[in-house]
Amino acid sequence: MKFKTAFPALAVLFAVLFEQAYAADPNPPTLHSNRGAWPIRRQWTGDEVLHYAKWVEHIYEMKTKGSVEQRIAKIQRIITDPEMNLLENPSFLGQGGNPQISSSVLRTIHASLDCAKLTCFLPTYYAYRRALPWMISYVYPTKGDVRTSDYNLVSGTMSTLDAGSASDFFIQASIGYSSGNYRVNLTGKNAQLSDTLPVAINPKFLLPGCMNYTDGHSLVLAKISDYGELHFLNCSTTETRDIFTYNGMNTVAGITPRGYDEKDEWNGCFQGLRVLRFPIALVNSAGDVVGIRRRTNKEMNEFGFSTEQYEIIRELTANQFIAEGTLKPQSFHDLIRLRMKSVDHIKPLEFMEAYADELLEVYQIREQFVQDAWREVLQNGPIVYPEELREENIFQAKGRWETWSSPSSDVDRRNKYFYLADWLDYAVRCYEMMPQFVRLDGLEKYNITSQAALSRALIDEKRRIFRAHSMSYKKSNRETVPLTLVDIEERLFDLSFDPNHPPELRWGAPAGSAERASAPERNTPVPNGERIPMEQAYVWQSYYRSLGQRETGMSALRGMFTEGFPVRKKLDQQLAKWFLFEQPVVVTASAKQPAPAPAPRSTSTRVHILVPRT
């Protein structure tokens, strides 16, 4: 390769770096094939899987730490933005990689994307760009819907050699793949043609790019923290097809224990964490690709195939703990953390102090967004609330509501707060299981000798740290109101997401307070043209302000229930269980708010579906 430049020395240096980049390819081309959907030049290897994991993890990092546009990016932006897609970097793509897919194919993919199709598209796209063999399976139900049947059977497969072009393969895969592809028993007909297999809970194999499947919902594992926490990428099923991060171990649930079915001990053992069944390109003596097949279960041992998840759940079900060396973790989540952590110890106080900085930052960013939204409403009028629409809801809408409302980002902020609660809860549990793992630096004055003492100390230190972290917001009359993290924690379920509301309500100013008295009346319009008074709309939105995840069904407003739904306990209450006995309660949302009389037109008593079946 020749480079023309006015600086010959730079050209030589660039050429050297260019060649070194290709030389650093973890899996250089060794195969030859120019037929089918795309050229195939590599086999899947352990190093290739690590390369894929790095690619997926980078997308997650950009979705959480990139610009505002990158954090809300849909699939077209993710794939075409060179900062988000490492495969747009020639050195990462490697020698013999395939070019970017067309914008028309990307539009087609976007239009059909859902949680399951995202888990299909990402490895398919990676295989295409890196010139790897790929295939998908077709499944059919034993009875009922393929997404919800007791189990499915594999009817056949389609490999890249079966398609005439890359666009054909992508489109066929987007049509044929659903969450039903995960519902294949290990011992069923053609089971060794399945797309995925259960994976070992082992840092060598449980990598970004693996999947998690729980009845009708699939996620892409995208990040494992130093402490062994699993973080995921998810895709909405609404028309906007948003891709968002899902930070929570609670999605790893619903796993069937081995032996649950006495007639077939492996029946139902398809939920949980799974690894892709990487295909093999069959080659002749000249290195030409002559076919593609699935790896067998035995061949997949190299990539982490294991049924241990179902054994673990069986032991936990029987004993309420599992023996892990000298330790006895009491939940599958704790076992995952113990096995997947990459640190020798944790320092709860140090973690809390650093995390409070991050938590404050996300609310400081929120303030700028609140002010921009208020300015938009003042200048261009009220924004219609997407009430009871088939194709839209408050989390996924079109136009101005999507741009200026904050229900989705507020879910993320609440989850960021509750992550701290969960992490500290984990630290208290670890103190009993392996006290040497929990370093008490900075907590010496508490003379900690028990889990109860540690939890009390962490609550005290959290309160101190939260009092020391503060920001401010501008009221509608431009007065400045200071808020500490203590204030934000107190108002956690009171922060309005409705862009029609003035900043006082957006920041949860208490009813009857001087802070709230300055809020001007601003109605919230609904699609039929009716305008809902501000205080009434605010109370009817109470349920949505309590959620820990986005909903996919229609959103209500008029006559929406305002109490009787469970609201998660905050950090102090969660840790208090270590030294107090508390009866479980159903918390009334927005208890400070007087509930208005229900609107006469309402018939709203609906079930809110939290997990889409795709």
Regions found by a protein language model. Name each.
Residues 1-8:
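Bacterial N-terminal signal peptides that target proteins for export
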Residues 8-16:
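Bacterial N-terminal signal peptides
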Residues 18-22:
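Sec/Tat signal peptide C-region and signal peptidase I cleavage site
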Residues 24-172, 187, 277-594, 607-610:
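Mixed-charge, low-complexity intrinsically disordered regions
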Residues 160-195, 237-282:
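A recognition module on extended beta-rich or small alphabeta surfaces enriched in W/G with H and D/E
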Residues 172-228:
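...with weaker cross-activation on analogous glycine-rich loops/strands in unrelated enzymes
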